[in-house]
């Protein structure tokens, strides 16, 4: 199943396009292997997810991170480092320009920010904004194969991107479409 949707993603992705796959630690290794068959993996971003809601109480270490796999169709891809550096709170601007942005994102919390209403399953607006800023320009297409409540679509629309979303649950898709149109 995962191989099928990743193959379709590779098929429709433009040559300079990118895929960002957000995963918890349990499935991260599997996704690394699967992505490696269709894409060029550029890096693994570690995002500090501060609210592990769906995680059972642990007898050992509580996981507070998610992996974001950044992969591209080719090694010639769009990456807007200057725009990401300007919008990053990770470091002061001088060292960001000197060092570049890092793959450790501890400055984005899993809480509601901005005017977008956060729905169940939505990632933080700032997280999606950073990803879209890094790998797209206004009027570029953003595809979300797991639209759920439409959070990525709402943010893409706010940022002037065109959006296509897929969702297997028809009721959920209709609610997401309504949400994207409204916001």
Report the location of each language-model feature.
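Short, conserved SAM-binding/catalytic segment
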Residues: 177-183
